[in-house]
């Protein structure tokens, strides 16, 4: 069953540093190993990132791998985080 993470920032989000994170972490044009989908975008009060993973282990591995780089780039922690096993994941 797929696993979803939802990260929400309620303040200004440093998209320039987020793009640098993706460039330094690997191929920005491809999804990381185990990631099935990613949606990133600004909202009126900050930003949202939603990712769908093959498993919670894939999501954790990605998070653990990139935590030092996130700290180095001083990307603030999200205001809210939700993580859950999906009951339905469909794509076209």
Placement of each model-derived feature along the sequence:
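Short S/T/G/P-rich N-terminal loop/turn motif that feeds into the first structured element of a domain
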Residues: 1-50, 54-69, 75-92
